[in-house]
UniProtKB/Swiss-Prot annotation:
The gene is argG. This is Argininosuccinate synthase. L-citrulline binds at Y90, S95, N126, R130, S179, S188, E265, Y277. It is found in: Cytoplasm. Pathway: Amino-acid biosynthesis; L-arginine biosynthesis; L-arginine from L-ornithine and carbamoyl phosphate: step 2/3. One of its GO terms (cellular component) is cytoplasm. Keywords: Amino-acid biosynthesis, Arginine biosynthesis, ATP-binding, Cytoplasm, Ligase, Nucleotide-binding.
Amino acid sequence: MYMKKFNKVILAYSGGLDTSIIIPWLKENYGCEVIAVVGNVGQSDELVGLKEKAIKTGASKIYIEDLTKEFVEDYIFPTIQAGAKYEGKYLLGTSFARPIIAKRLVEIAKLEGADAICHGCTGKGNDQVRFELAIKTFNPEMQIIAPWRTWEIKSREEEIQYAIDNEVPINITYETNYSKDKNLWHLSHEGLDLEFPENEPKYDKILELCNTLEKAPNEAEYITLGFEKGIATSLNGEKLDGVTLLQELNKIGGKHGIGVIDMVENRLVGMKSRGVYETPGGSILYKAHKDLEELCLDKETSHYKEIVSLKFADLVYNGQWFTPLREALSAFISKTQETVTGEIKLKLYKGNIINAGMTSPYSLYSEEYATFGEDGIYNQKDAEGFINLFSLPSIVQAKMAQKLN
């Protein structure tokens, strides 16, 4: 048993291997009451049987908190508006799910009068930082227990053996022991053969949300998305709330094998890791939103927003959601979205998302100016004066070089 004594500990619980064995481990080593807290951010089928499992494993109580609506409206949609992709590919599915869960953990810890909050994140991963930054933001004095940084278990194989020895029910084996994270936005897969970059992912065995390209339909499907101020509000002409819209897009996108990426990323803690991510609905929303922005944003705003998007992605990935900078960037992004309203038609086919036409009352595209045909608005002779002025720095530089030579 560890030296420090806690009376009541709040555990961020998922029902997976890590948090399942942590319940008996906490009781054995700290002699404490364990209250499990599940943040429902759209895990769907993973929630089935969690209450019974947590109690059977030794928890005195379990909270299953429905955070799905808040997750979509306050975390997912603002990140889509930002156009944030970590290292140009990752749509941040795990990253922005952690702050909302951590915030609720602190609230329940206060409600229950708990001494500490415990999470099951490894000492090599990003999630430990994301959870603990958020916890410290809302309660700097809260004690945090991170078993992976203290216990003698060093691998998932040893975790499985611990579960067997302590009669903890699990539904995985040594052979299917991928580390997964699922929510309404995405499903990630890490570990096993994926730890070796030379290995091609076994998509037919890994994928759960998406079809492989071979199994995707041979016929394309067209959909129409409506946006209001950068937020998707309708699908095929039907107004939908954010949760329902994303659920529908996940089904449609998954059917067509959309949103699967195999990525080697730079973790916050310094190492590289490899993962396969399934984000079918999210990938459709990102493509639609980005294309609509191209129609509605002016050049200077669009180009500067690219810089903001990169920083926004880093902040989210690093667990810095609850920071003044993230809030300031969100304020800028919100301003840019005032005219991102309209409809976009998309063609979905075997992993591809193809723009099939879009309209907006705020469109900055003018056929009168852009046409290659005859027009009476744009005087092409004006281009000569513009080029003379625009090229002036280059001309001066060239003349200086000639003098030196």
